[in-house]
Structure formats: C-alpha cells, structure tokens
C-alpha cells in the first residue's frame, strides 16, 4: 500500500478529531487511516455507524462478495412492514455496501473491473429487492395482475447504460425501462385495476422508494427518459406496445442505447426470454449495417459539438478523449457488425474491445491503448466520486482533493497525474477522430488563393492604400472593407486574446477575406460577420472550427450575406456555428414529424434534475432548428407554406417539452391530482390560437395559448404536500409561462400571450373545459368566436382534445344572423385598422392595411361562422389556406376566387418571411402588391360590405 503523501498526512490530523467513539489513532490499521483520509463519504458513514468500521477492520472486503448481496438484503428487509421502513433499509444497505466498495477500491484490494461489477450488482440487487417487496405489497392492496388466462404478470425492468453493461460508476444515476407482458386485470384484491394502472402505480412507488431523498439520503437517482416516447410516454409498457414502438418508430440512437440493455434479476423464465427475443432484431441487424454510418457520424458530430459548446476541458467523461468517446468507438462496431458477429453483442465494453481486436477491426495497438485508457479513466472517475459520493466527472480545483486523487492513482503528485491523463485522453481522441472520418482540409489551391490576403489582414492597410486583391472593388466598397478591417483590429486590441487565439485568427482571416471580398456585396457581408468574430475571439474553439472546416466558413459567409437576422443570431449565440459543419443537415430541416424525437434525444444529454441546463438546452435546440429552417428558406428548398409548417411543428415540440418539465417539477412537489388515478393522461391541454393554431408561424412569432383542465371540484393532489387539484393546474400553467419566458444566456424560448383565454387578462390563467364551453356559448364576443376558427389543441390527452374539438364545432356551427355577423366582423376589422393600420402613410403594411393578410383572415373567419351550420365540414381545419379550399369545395366561394385569395395570401406571407430574414419591418412601398391588394379588397367588398 502506498504511504500517504505529505498533504494527506497533514489532513489525517483533522480526521483523527472526528473518529467515532471507541476508535483512536493507534487502534486503527494503516488501511483504515488511508481510506478515512481519502474519502469524506466513508468517514461520515462510519461516524454514523461505527459497527461498519469494526466490521471492515476485522475482515477486509472480498472480490466475490457481490454474490452475497441478495442474501444480505433479504435479511435486512425481513422486518420491513411499510414503504417508509423499506426506504430506510434500502438506503442503509446501499450506504453500508458502498463503504465496503470504497474501502476495496481505495486500497486496490480488488481490481478495477471487479469494482465496476460490484457497483452494478449492488444496484441490481437493490432494484430487484425493492421491486419484489413492492409488487407483493401492491398485490395485497389491489390484487395480482393477470392475463385473460389467469396467469400472473410480472414487472420486468431493463437496466440501461452502464447499469446494463455491468459498468456502473460509484455515484451513478440509473436508467431504467419498465415493461409487463400482457393486458388483463388484477384478481383477488379489494378492488380491480387493469394491468396498465397496476404497473403504473407499482412503477411510481418503486421510483419513489429508490429516488426520493429522505433523512437517510436516497438509493439512486432514477432516470426513465430512455423509455419509448420519453417523459410523454406511459411509465410502463406492455410487450405489445414495446414491440410496436421499436418496430415502427425506434430511432438509431435508441438502438445505440439498447445495446447495453439487460433485464434486472435476469431470470431465465418464459417472459424474460420473450422480451429478449423481441428486442434482439431491433438492436442487431442480421447484415452488416452500413446504413447506420451517417447516423453514427451525426452522433459523433453531436459529441464533438458538445465538447466545444460546454468547454469540457476537465471532464473525464464528456471531454475530448473521455470515457464517452471510448464507449462510442466500441458501439460503432457493435451497431454496424453486431448482427453478423455474435462476439460483438456483449453489453460490456471490455469484452467487446477484445472482440474488436480478435476480428482485426482496429489495430492491436489502438485496442491496447483504449483498454488501458478506459481502466485508467474509470478508476479515476470512481475515486473522484467516492470522495463525497457525488456524481461528478470534473477534476477538482482544490489542493486536498487533487492530492487525494494523485495518491489514489499512484502518481507522485498532481502534475504527474494530469500528464498521464492527458496522454490517455489524447490516444482516445486520435482513434475517435479517425473513426468514420469526415474532417475537411484546405487544398493547396485554397492556400495559394488566400496568401495575398495575409497582407490585407496583417499589414493594417489604410483606406487610401491600394492593393491588387482589392482592385476589383469599387472605390467606396474598397474603403468600407479596409475601414471594417481596421475597426475590427482595434476592437481586438481591447480583448484578452491568448497566443493560441491570435495564431488561429491569423490563420483564419486571410481565408475569410478571400471568400468575402470575391462577392459583389463584400462590404455588407463583412459588416455582418465582424461582430460575430468579435464575439468569439476569446473562445478559441469556435475560431478553430471556422479555421479547420473551410466548408463551415463558406456557409457562414453565404448565410450572413443573405440574412442579417441569421448573422445576428450567430453573433448572439455562437454555439450555432456547430450547425454549419454539416450541409446535409443545415439545408435540410428536421422532418416535420421528427421534431419531438430530435428534441427528446437532445434533452437526454442533460441531467433531468438540472433545471437550469434543461432551460438552456431547450433554447439552444430551438435556435439551431430555426437556423436550419432559415437556411433552407434562403436556399429556396422550402416554400412559404413549408416554412410555417416547420416553425409550427418546432413550436409544438417545444410546448410538449416545456409541459413535460413543468409537470415533472409540479408532481415532484405536490403529487398529481387524485382524479387521474382513475384515468389515463394528465387532464390538461394547451390550445394554440392565431398563427400557431393556423399553422402560420413566422420567424419571430409569439405563441397565443390558453390552458384547459378537467379537474372536478374538491379533488386534492396525492403528494406529501397536498394542494387543491385546480390550484395544481393553475400553478402548472404559471410554471409553463415561467419556463417559456425566463431569460437565460441563450435568451427566452418564446413570448407567450395568454390573453385570448375566457375573460382575457382578467380571467383565470387556466380554465376547466366545462367553464370554457359555458363561456364560449353564453359570454364570448363574436371576435372570440372568430379566434376560435384558428384554434386547435397543440398539447393534450385525447379525452380533453375531443372535448375541446366538440366545443369548437358546436360554437362554429351555431346558426347566426348574417347581417348582424357581417356588421360585427366588419366593425371589428375597422377598429383594428384604426388602431394598427396605416401607421406609415406612404407605405403598405402587409399585415394590417386594407387589402392585406388580416383582411383575408377575416373573410375566411366570417364565412366559416356564417355558413358552418349549413356545411359542418367547414370546421375541419384551422389554417386559412385549407379553409379557403373548404369554402370552394362546399360551394360557398367560387373556386377561382378561393385560389386567387390563396395565392395572394401565400405571396404576402412569403414577403413577410423574407423581410424578417432581412430584419426589416413588415411594410413596403405603396406600389408593391397592387394586384393582390385589389383582389383582396374586391373580395372584402363582396362579402363584408353591407349591400
């Protein structure tokens, strides 16, 4: 055993003062002295439980003692009579065994692979023990869940990630997926439940038993986000639902996660065999699967971008060359070749590395370096976490913990440890970079082309200087370019740029100037790019990105030249520069039906309990997607209707995620309203009005939302902090508004306007569905019924969605007096025009002025309210284009007029989109769009001017 280093010997004196009664400095072994000096977690634990220290002093932990965990836990749970005592015993058992593992690990009594195995077996033992106790308790309360043939149904638990691979780290959270075999009902209990309800309640109690902090701490943080549909999906799924999801909707990244999935308790019963057989074809294809390469390349890009974005230099898991990159390297081969090569199907990393070597998929030396690096990094990670039983992978900044880690890793001192770590991570990064290579490099021709621009950049030319490379520019443009360069250099003098930053900038700028100044709009483009560069000069990683990836630089120049809005976004949020790396995704927005899944995958990388990082991630995802939509718009690959479709689908995905976050936070605090025990869903809906409801969002549109619930009176929540159910939904809506509007370093998510709710700003923020129906039928104004034409549920369970749709249909199909309706709609429009329109006397406001977009919207709304009682099909859609189609199909409007209004409407909206990209207001010269305006005005007179 290595003697304690000088700083640790000094710290031992502090430990001596805290030793439990009955133990003295002289009575303790050298082993105990080392462990208690190294780990505050171990010290705190034995102070609270001195018998654990006596136990360890009398007999050291053994490598194979994990085989006894299940028996030891069974003894500990023998006297448990309720959930509270179960939670206490689970927490004490976990702490006791973790002290034993920390002891063995610190002293190297057991090799590092066995430590990972012990940590994983401990977690599995606790999960299975808690499940089995709670299953029996739930059966006593509600009966045993059975299939239609009367066969009892178990809860099967898939351990994912490091837990599934038998490689859990010291203070890890656990990723789980719950499943049960077949539908049916409980039998033999005081009341009958269907199996879905039974297993959901069991799952909730199991998570609480493991996850909820008490005075004894918690057992494990439980993360359920890897299940189908993530947080928005059922907590527990039947085999049929699982199979359907993975066959029809399973994504490549879910295959990636499922490689390590392992059944907890791992019984060889028929149900377990069936579940394994069902999942195997999804994970491992029977052929060599090169189709997954692009998906893996995208994952690799995501990893590299996250390293850049979060500046994870001291993170041994997520940083460049860290644990995650080794895991990725191994899983690349598993996903591509695992179907054909059974030896690659191991859930554990090290056996898979051996198989990669045996199959000659990587050079022997690379495999050897990866193995050594992996074991080094995993030991370092576990030692780091065992100091305080804290889930961290970030190297410490304080001298004491640095001294501890250097001693634990058998290094002379901290600098030596950092040197060894740097070498290992560099080896990993090299293999990672060479895998699925997609890096770019300058060609000799590009180098030659940029060489003359070094003079322009480095020699600080004056406005009146002449230089051959600027000769093609007009005098004014040349002066502007030189002024911009000079001003930029002055700005740089004020910034604390290190030597590496200066070096990269000097390498980048000649290339950038060569590309920018070859354009006719060189001065304008450069004026948009220099603010962005000024914002990132102290962040060398982003300069390196533009310098090392010429393609990214070209896309930056093209997009900034095309749109000052994009230039402003990139300057404000430089992490968006990562999006420029892959033109395949930059100009191809996410498929409209895939935004939710992409966002779910994006959020999985952020700890669920880290609310601040969750807020940042939502905003970053939105900005990246917005950039891709705008890039496709500029490139002409998205017509106006599709731009709005994408912006709307994106907004719906964000709403879904925000509601999930708010719901999770509220339920953690109060439990959920008790009426939900008897039904599926959350009893909550978000209704989108206006542009969101009508699939017509623009780049800077806010969201018009109202919130509905179906909670009866006098219902309470079922948590420890019990509140009224309706109060719960009010606080939920307030939380949603807060999550949307909180300003982080990445800005706000969306401006949200909830004033279209019943009684407007004076009304309750959230309304019961019954109260909403009553208000619409008896109190709402005509303009509120007009707004309802463009309303639809954008988040909600089927029950509430059907209820809202029925109310909307009833209101819209109510017979109205034609003259009265015509007058009210026309007068409302005149009021709006007086308030909003014609502010720029010599300009045409595309939206608000006569003959503009709002007139078309009012015509469509009027005709739906006027004729829907005769033609109920008019209520089907909430967007103007399809409403105009319906009006023609149902004989209300002449087909030629409907088509002409549609063309006018899409033309005007297209112009608004492009004005937004140019950061210009929504008005143009009076001479513009005269044909469209005349057509709209004629239609207005036909329908809404009294005869």
Swiss-Prot record:
Its EC number is 2.7.7.89, 2.7.7.42. Its cofactor is Mg(2+). Pfam families: GlnD_UR_UTase (PF08335), GlnE (PF03710). It catalyses: [glutamine synthetase]-O(4)-(5'-adenylyl)-L-tyrosine + phosphate = [glutamine synthetase]-L-tyrosine + ADP; [glutamine synthetase]-L-tyrosine + ATP = [glutamine synthetase]-O(4)-(5'-adenylyl)-L-tyrosine + diphosphate. The keyword Nucleotidyltransferase applies. It is an enzyme of class 2 (transferase). GO terms for cellular component: cytosol. GO terms for molecular function: [glutamate-ammonia-ligase] adenylyltransferase activity; [glutamine synthetase]-adenylyl-L-tyrosine phosphorylase activity; ATP binding; magnesium ion binding. It comes from the Bacteria. One of its GO terms (biological process) is regulation of glutamine family amino acid metabolic process. Residues 1-440 are annotated as: Adenylyl removase. Residues 450-947 are annotated as: Adenylyl transferase. Coiled coil: none annotated. Keywords: ATP-binding, Magnesium, Multifunctional enzyme, Nucleotide-binding, Nucleotidyltransferase, Transferase. NCBIfam families: PRK11072.1 (NF008292). Belongs to the GlnE family. Involved in the regulation of glutamine synthetase GlnA, a key enzyme in the process to assimilate ammonia. When cellular nitrogen levels are high, the C-terminal adenylyl transferase (AT) inactivates GlnA by covalent transfer of an adenylyl group from ATP to specific tyrosine residue of GlnA, thus reducing its activity. Conversely, when nitrogen levels are low, the N-terminal adenylyl removase (AR) activates GlnA by removing the adenylyl group by phosphorolysis, increasing its activity. This is Bifunctional glutamine synthetase adenylyltransferase/adenylyl-removing enzyme. It comes from Salmonella schwarzengrund (strain CVM19633).
